[in-house]
C-alpha cells in the first residue's frame, strides 16, 4: 500500500491561529504568485457576488510572510501555514484527540506567556 511520506493540512478561514507557531509548517508561496491567483480563480463562487476571497487569501499569504518572524527581516514574500497531519495516516489515531492536543499545547503556551508577563 502506497502512502505519502508527509500529509499537511491548511485551514482557510482561520489560518491555524490555535496552533503554536513552532508547530506550524511554513509553505513558501513566494516563487509562484501567478499560480496562487490561478488556483483561486478556479473557484468562481468564491470570487463573484461581492466577496473577494481570492484577494483576501493573497493578502493573508503576504501578511503571514511578514508576521511569521516579527523580529527579523522577511524570509518569504508569501507564506501559507499548514499543520502536520501525517500521524493521522495511522487509523488508530483519533482525529479529535489529535487536534485537541494542539489546542491544549496552545492554551498552555498562552498561560505561560501571560504568567511571565505578570511576574515581572
Please annotate each region the language model reported.
Residues 3-6, 10-120:
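C-terminal accessory domains and tails appended to enzymatic cores
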Amino acid at each position: 500500500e502506497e502512502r505519502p511520506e508527509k500529509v499537511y493540512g491548511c485551514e482557510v478561514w482561520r489560518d491555524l491561529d490555535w496552533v503554536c507557531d513552532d508547530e506550524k509548517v511554513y509553505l513558501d508561496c513566494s516563487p509562484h504568485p501567478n499560480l496562487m491567483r490561478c488556483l483561486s480563480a478556479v473557484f468562481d463562487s468564491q470570487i463573484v457576488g461581492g466577496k473577494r476571497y481570492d484577494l483576501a487569501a493573497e493578502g493573508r499569504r503576504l501578511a503571514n510572510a511578514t508576521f511569521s518572524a516579527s523580529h527579523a527581516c522577511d524570509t518569504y514574500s508569501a507564506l501559507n501555514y499548514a499543520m502536520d497531519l501525517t500521524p493521522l495516516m495511522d487509523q488508530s489515531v483519533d482525529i479529535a484527540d489529535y487536534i485537541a492536543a494542539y489546542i491544549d499545547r496552545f492554551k498552555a503556551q498562552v498561560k505561560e506567556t501571560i504568567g511571565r508577563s505578570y511576574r515581572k
